[in-house]
Amino acid sequence: MGNCCGSKPLTASDIVSDQKQETILGKPLEDIKKHYSFGDELGKGNFGTTYLCKENSTGKSYACKSIPKRTLSSEEEKEAVKTEIQIMDHVSGQPNIVQIKGSYEDNNSIHIVMELCGGGELFDKIDALVKSHSYYSEKDAAGIFRSIVNAVKICHSLDVVHRDLKPENFLFSSKDENAMLKAIDFGCSVYIKEGKTFERVVGSKYYIAPEVLEGSYGKEIDIWSAGVILYILLSGVPPFQTGIESIIVSTLCIVDAEIKECRLDFESQPWPLISFKAKHLIGKMLTKKPKERISAADVLEHPWMKSEAPDKPIDNVVLSRMKQFRAMNKLKKLALKVIAEGLSEEEIKGLKTMFENMDMDKSGSITYEELKMGLNRHGSKLSETEVKQLMEAADVDGNGTIDYIEFISATMHRHRLERDEHLYKAFQYFDKDGSGHITKEEVEIAMKEHGMGDEANAKDLISEFDKNNDGKIDYEEFCTMMRNGILQPQGKLVGIHI
């Protein structure tokens, strides 16, 4: 608007920046702020930040994912961003998939403008369902899951494999009761090629298919990940609980016997009360052999999905577990960091030296590039994606670097959690007033200090681990959470060892 008449002449620097500078997206550089005004930060990852933005010409709100170009240090990373945008364009316009508005590149960043999905995550919706009609049923779960599988079906029909399906990558379009659930993140997605399999380890812990760990896979991995989501929707916990303790800065080569053998627990609560047809569908989706796995189209035709899911309430323990599963990562990461701060030089042995060797510029923190080079020196053959996942796992405060304490907390041996003196020090950190109990306010303060949570998370954590219902967590309850929580490691590691 108003750019055709009366605009000021181009300067020499404009001409250089717009015409001569090599671009990543292959189109002229453009100032996105000519078209959009930026507002609050909506979310942040290690390699990009999503902002609320408003289109100047219409006043309509969108989400904008901005990726600093300095984080795209390799051709592989640049191609990945281009592929993400191409795939979003390719699948845009379909139900249950976020709509892309446009992409821009300036001197500093690449910007992806997309539909704003302001209705919250899956678990938020389930909370709302419980509050609106006092219970959550298999029928509710089937309605939610239908949208997830439909997104997978669309991707596969358009020759796209998502590769990173998880609850966090789905958002509701609005707060309306009938809002549509949409897949929002295609950063790991690739095109399917006839007869070609993929080798690179991608995806997120809990949702990764066994063939990904074995190094040869196809689109069937999306069915596995969706099956894990359904298991969580019906029980509140994932079927294969490989947590943050299994991903340390020494390796990302996880070999988890439980995943590879596909052992499913249908005996513990609430499974005896869940319908046979629901368990039958999960079994079809979490079949070890990819070629025997049910397709997305057939999932949608399964009897449980076609209005046969019971409408009776699921045990309240399921909702309780979901809240725990969502909030536990943050508190346990923070507690591990507190324990790491209290370890002696003797206890951490060679970890300090390893950190110093990786911290090439002696800044006191390890950048992505330093982590990548350090792992290479130790003989690691990790891909760019795998190094990124390590970075995300170890970077507790989400500032894009790993400081010394974060490094120690990610690499220290987990038997430290068995020692009472370490657990007590961590407990004392949260117990600010020395009362012998941790309150919601104390959890909230600790998590806010590290930029790791909000009041809702703190309240959920207190309620889930407060076994005697006094509104506080005592020391015994804290130890139980740390030692026996859902993030207890169950796999083993191969690769580099410290």
UniProtKB/Swiss-Prot annotation:
Binding-site list for Ca(2+) 3: 431, 433, 435, 437, 442
Pfam family, one: Pkinase
CDD domains hit by this protein: STKc_CAMK
Membrane-topology annotation of the record: Lipid-anchor
A GO cellular component entry from the record: membrane
Residues bearing the modification Phosphoserine: 204
Binding site for Ca(2+) 4: 466, 468, 470, 472, 477
Catalytic activity: L-seryl-[protein] + ATP = O-phospho-L-seryl-[protein] + ADP + H(+); L-threonyl-[protein] + ATP = O-phospho-L-threonyl-[protein] + ADP + H(+)
Binding site for ATP: 42-50, 65
Domain Protein kinase: 36-305
Region: Autoinhibitory domain, residue numbers: 309-339
Role played: May play a role in signal transduction pathways that involve calcium as a second messenger.
The family this protein is said to belong to: Belongs to the protein kinase superfamily. Ser/Thr protein kinase family. CDPK subfamily.
The protein, known as: Calcium-dependent protein kinase 22
Organism: Arabidopsis thaliana
